[in-house]
Amino acid sequence: MKTIAFIALFIIISVPAVSLAEGPPPLTLEEAVKTALVHNRPLLSEGEKLKASEAGVGEAASAFLPKANVSETFVRSDNPVTVFGSKLNQGNFQASDFAIDKLNSPSPINDFNFRVQVIQPLFNGGKELIGYRRAKLALESAKMTHERARMETAYETVQAYWGVALAGEYIKTAKQAEKSTEKHVNLAQDLYGQGMLLRSEVLLAKVHLADVEEMLIKAENREATAKAALNMILGRPQDTPVTIADSLAYAPFPGSLESLQGEALKDRPDLKGMKYNVENTGEGVRMAQTDYLPDINLIGQYDRDSRDFFGHGGDSYTLMGRLTWNVFDGFLTTNKVREARANRNAASYMYDQMKEGALFEVRKAYNDLQEAKKRMDVESAAVKEGRESLRIITERFGAGMAKSLDVIDADTALTRARTNYAAALYDYNVAEAALRLAIGEKY
């Protein structure tokens, strides 16, 4: 008996643990956003672009440093000048090589030239410094783009999360309608059995029940699709089980339109990023103008020539300074400067347009928020009235004072009011998220 009691106790204790292990814990909105900011694939892509911009700064900085090259060159020739020079370079020139026949018709010679060359830029019109500044500006712009991508990912997560919640509300509404319609069908059948109702009234009630069941099927499919969409944004397999913890609710959003628009102009990272781009195009004008100036480089070179590969022979060094000045290039530089100035002006116009666009986005989201709140108030009252209307008409139907169609109309109106209220509540929460995105609020 003790063994049986122990087994029974073990089963009782274990069953809840097993049931809890069957599915993941409910997902809160905050957890969903945090997950998306870590695993969302488009956001990860933006992160790699940011790394590329960071590498671009290092790439630009390398222009300040010397460049070193090592080479090994093989030449076999019987050209008199080449043979003469190669013998000198190899330190292998003999007095007999001055013989006229050897000078004019020398035997072929092998020459392996090992060379180390170092080039140090001294002045190239400021290309190195301007290129470095442009890379730094591009990095700052990339940081702002990445920050904006984080905000957009958070917004998409909120929208998808509330999409799951809305689908759940639709399922709840459909089940409520199904329950009330089933009661109506049963009542209609009872009245028909008592001879108080026509068969057509019963059939009409059953048709309405079929419509409600179809609505439930669509709502369940909508929920499955919404969960797959949420999983995709979270960077998870689309068939990952999802249970959300938070429900659609109303919370007032503080701030006037004017103050919110001011926040957008001050805080939005995409505007800051575009401002960096405008500065970068200004540097582009200065970069184009550097072609008017000379290039000065210092070159150091070490050579070793021998008859064999990496063999021992004559060696030498060379130091030189090189100045190159393109005094006329067919107006190429002039047109490059014109192009750069046009790009700078275009970026400036785009920056102004982006600011106007940001103000409009705030205005639209703000108006959508106000509209959704008004719809919520209207539909909330409609739900209360619809519920009372259905109760009254159902009682009248049971007393033989109303038709089946009256009950169906009342039930349909209540279902529509419940659906509209859920949609308005969803629109309010999404509009709030859109407003936070529009003003540049960080998550």
Segments predicted by a language model, with ranges:
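Acidic, low-complexity, intrinsically disordered peripheral segments
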Residues: F6, L20-E22, R76-D78, N420-Y443
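Bacterial N-terminal signal peptides
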Residues: I7-P16
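Small/polar (Gly/Ser/Thr/Ala-rich) solvent-exposed segments
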Residues: L44, K67-T82, L103-I109, I119-R148, ...
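Bacterial Sec-pathway N-terminal export signals of envelope proteins
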Residues: L20-T73, N79-P80, P121, Q238, ...
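Transmembrane beta-barrel architecture of outer-membrane proteins
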Residues: D111-N113, Q159, L204, S259, ...
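Residues on the lipid-exposed face of transmembrane beta-strands in outer-membrane beta-barrel proteins
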Residues: V116-Q120, L230, G321-W325, A424
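Amphipathic alpha-helical coiled-coil segments
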Residues: S45-A60, A149, T153-K172, K183, ...
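Periplasmic alpha-helical coiled-coil/stalk elements that build and connect Gram-negative outer-membrane
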Residues: L27, H146-E263, A365-D368, A372
